[in-house]
From Swiss-Prot:
Cytoplasmic side, ranges: 713-788
SMART domains assigned: CA (SM00112)
Cellular component GO terms held in the UniProt record: plasma membrane
GO MF annotations, alphabetized: calcium ion binding
Segments crossing the lipid bilayer: 692-712
Extracellular side, ranges: 29-691
Protein name (database record): Protocadherin beta-18
Length: 788
């Protein structure tokens, strides 16, 4: 590949022929080493650590390696001590043929940071080849009229060794007619020539046999021989002459086999057999004989083997024309091989780092590779590129070496794998290209916090639940991978310091399931909220939180509680109802509450038992007890009512209230409590005498008082008295009870207190002033219960 002038190229393309790096990547100094060919594998050459001033630890840590220009592993680097060792036996003749000196160029590559150390290895020749002649017999036809001192060229020997190990001398067997003269040729080679010392006489001796010996300069020297047969001919006084001393021809390397290269023509003024010419090669190299052939009669030169500009750019072909009298003429053909674009670029990966972390800094080296094209000129100039829209870029480093580096930030959650196609195209016609695919994986770092599926969760739990009940779940996901995406859940400290969160709920750290630790009571706690956290297992760990609201659903676990009349087992209060009461007369109102909520606290009332069915009725929605019909003198005075209070839960719960009702003709007559039990026999005996005497003495007066009282009451019948009742305890209800009916007291009624003085045996009736004035103009319609 030939260097060329640099020119600007589009983004991501790199012209290979103008790469010249400065800075610390490449050291300008070139280290030179040498070794003799055919040495054993493992032979020590040098210690690069000492030569280049490096540390042994850098060899492994920075991935040190040896790279030759032709990518063959001639040497290897021992990472333990930095010794440069022979990796395979070297054959100088196979590597460099006749080129001297035989130098192999290589680089010592270090990564992170990227550094190149240029070096070269001189392969020294040893004397391992013997000089050989192409022909075992050399035929010379010499006219007997040849003048003394005439030179006769003879074939030279070939020795694959070079320098002093090549052919250094020729000798010929002793004879009276010839001596040997050596002529220096191209590339320091020596060519033998016979010099005529004594005239030949065909009649005396028509043929001579001589032994030619070739000796090299090795130690010990090697030699080879051939036999020269000299045939003495009649006199031929004109030698052949070529048209040109040198012919020059340009041949494309893609020329087909057997194609005509050139026709060389010579003339001879002699006639007859002395004028008949034959053409042949003269002192040509092995490559020439392998590649070309000459027609002995016409002098046409044909292509015998393929040409390859990348191996040999030109050939010098020495030809001769010999007439029938053994006189010869000489000429040369310079064949210049014309390069064609027949070699695509080559890509050799040196290193590849995969996977790379997604938080890699810009300019991080991902891959290092080298490229080359064996063509010349524009055919060997190359441009490299990768696909667009990738966060990578190609950058030149050292001669024919390039680095694939990061250009933009990476995000594994957006893309975790890149399939990169490196394309190298030459500038020949037609253009040839080579592609190499690499896969770069992006490894995860913990850069994403867990995210809950919802910012807040609302959970519903029915009260009286069993402990360890699963009440719901929270879920969070993490866009990272591996342990960075493994989420654990936890309860965060509540904002309310009085909320005993640790005793209410727990959370499964692995799946986010929430459990109630104990039975919840709606009447004690209707709702509470707390925060849950989700934390990944990355380093450092990232977390997020979400709000959880727990609403306790009411269950029908509270029976109605009767506030009035009191059901505490003490002396019952008795409701007084005048016999003159109209139908719908308000006797009293049963007041009850339910600790539940919603429909579980909707209360309904019904008359469960009555002394006289049909006389009283209970309003189902507000608990008012009213007369169902007009009272008569035939109705008994004492009545016992049992009112059932029932909620609307499922299943419903209930309570009962017992009422004592006394029918009176008027509120001026004394009140006698309903006896619950007969007086003891002892008390009856002690009072019998006194009662009989008192009854007899006052009976007349008593009857008169009764008649007078009845007359007065009849006059006042138009002003019926309102109901009397015992006082309802005043003050707030207990905090855990809720009056949902909205009627906590008797409405539009009088309040009475009728009590019996305990232990006196005498009845005392107290008439109290009304608390709320009675509205006589009340509507005849029943009061509607408040809506639920």
């Amino acid at each position: 590949m030939e260097p060329g002038k640099g020119r600007a190229q589009p983004t991501r393309q790199v012209l290979l022929f103008f790469v010249f790096l400065g800075g610390s990547l490449v050291y300008s100094e070139t280290w030179s080493y040498s070794i003799a060919e055919e040495m054993e594998v493992g032979t020590f050459i040098a210690n690069v650590v000492k030569d280049m001033g490096l540390d042994v630890e850098d060899l492994v840590a920075r991935g040190a390696r040896v790279i030759f220009d032709d990518y063959k592993p001639y040497l290897r680097l021992d990472p333990q001590n930095g010794d440069l060792l022979l990796n395979e036996q070297l054959d100088r003749e196979a590597l460099c043929d006749l080129t001297e000196p035989c130098i192999l160029h290589f680089q010592v590559l270090f990564e992170n940071p990227l550094q190149f150390f240029r070096a070269e290895l001189l392969v020294k020749d040893i004397n391992d080849h013997t000089p050989t002649f192409l022909n075992n017999h050399i035929l010379l036809k010499i006219s007997e009229g040849a003048t003394l001192g005439t030179l006769f060229q003879i074939d030279s020997a070939q020795d694959l060794d070079v320098g002093k190990n090549g052919v250094q001398n020729y000798t010929i067997s002793p004879n009276p007619h010839f001596h040997l003269k050596l002529r220096d040729g191209d590339e320091g080679r020596k060519y033998p020539e016979l010099v005529l010392d004594q005239s030949l006489d065909r009649e005396k001796e028509s043929q001579l046999s001589l032994t030619l010996t070739a000796v090299d300069g090795g130690s010990p020297p090697r030699s080879g021989t051939t036999l020269i047969n000299v045939v003495v001919l009649d006199i031929n006084d004109n030698a052949p002459e070529f048209e040109k001393p040198v012919y020059e021809v340009h041949v494309p390397e893609s020329s087909p086999l057997d194609s005509l290269i050139i026709k060389a023509s010579a003339t001879d003024l002699d006639a007859g057999i002395n004028g008949e010419l034959s053409y042949s090669f003269s002192h040509v190299s092995r490559d020439v004989r392998k590649t070309f052939e000459i027609h002995p009669i016409s002098g046409e030169v044909y292509l015998k083997a393929p040409l390859d500009f990348e191996i040999i750019q030109s050939y010098i072909i020495n030809i001769q024309a010999i007439d029938g009298g053994s006189l010869s003429g000489k000429s040369s053909i310079l064949v210049r091989v014309v390069d064609v674009n027949d070699n695509p670029p080559e890509i050799a990966m040196t290193s590849l780092t995969s996977p790379i972390p997604e938080n890699s800094s810009p300019e991080m080296v991902v891959a290092v590779f080298s490229i080359r094209d064996q063509d010349a000129g524009d055919n060997g100039r190359m441009v490299g590129s990768i696909q667009d829209n990738l966060p990578f870029v190609l950058k030149p480093t050292f001669k024919n070496f390039y680095a694939l580096v990061t250009e933009h930030p990476l995000d594994r959650e957006v893309r975790n794998e890149y399939n990169i196609t490196i394309t190298v195209t030459d500038l020949g016609t037609p253009r040839l290209k080579t592609q190499h695919n690499i896969t770069v994986l992006v490894s995860d770092v913990n850069d994403n916090a867990p995210a809950f599926t919802q910012t807040s969760y609302t959970l519903f739990v029915r009260e009286n639940n069993s402990p360890a009940l699963h009440i719901g779940s929270v879920s969070a996901t993490d866009r990272d991978s591996g342990t960075n995406a493994q989420v654990t859940y936890s309860l965060l400290p509540p904002q309310d310091p009085h909320l005993p969160l640790a005793s209410l709920v727990s959370i499964n750290t692995d799946n986010g399931h929430l459990f109630a630790l104990r039975s919840l009571d709606y009447e004690a706690l209707q709702a509470f909220e707390f925060h849950v956290g989700a934390t990944d297992r990355g380093s450092p760990a990232l977390s997020s939180e979400a709000l959880v609201r727990v609403l306790v659903l009411d269950a029908n676990d509270n029976s109605p509680f009767v506030l009035y009349p009191l059901q505490n087992g003490s002396a019952p209060c008795t409701e007084l109802v005048p016999r003159a009461a109209e139908p719908g007369y308000l006797v009293t109102k049963v007041v009850a509450v339910d600790g539940d909520s919603g429909q579980n606290a909707w209360l309904s009332y019904q008359l469960l038992k009555a002394t006289e069915p049909g006389l009283f009725g209970v309003w189902a929605h507000n608990g008012e007890v009213r007369t169902a019909r007009l009272l008569s003198e035939r109705d008994v005075a004492k009545h016992r009512l049992v009112v059932l209070v029932k909620d609307n839960g499922e299943p419903p719960r209930s309570a009962t209230a017992t009422l004592q009702v006394l029918l009176v003709d008027g509120f001026s007559q004394p009140y006698l409590p309903l006896p619950e039990a007969a007086p003891s026999q002892a008390q009856a005996d002690s009072l019998t005498v006194y009662l009989v005497v008192a009854l007899a003495s006052v009976s007349s007066l008593f009857l008169f008082s009764v008649f007078l009282f009845v007359a007065v009451r009849l006059c006042r019948r138009s002003r019926a008295a309102s109901v009397g009742r015992c006082s309802v305890p005043e003050g707030p209800f207990p905090g855990h009870l809720l009056d949902v009916s909205g009627t906590g007291t008797l409405s539009q009624s009088y309040q009475y207190e009728v009590c019996l003085t305990g232990g006196s045996g005498a009845n005392e009736f107290k008439f109290l002033k009304p608390v709320i004035p009675n509205l006589l103009s009340r509507d005849s319609d029943m009061e509607k219960a408040p809506p639920f």
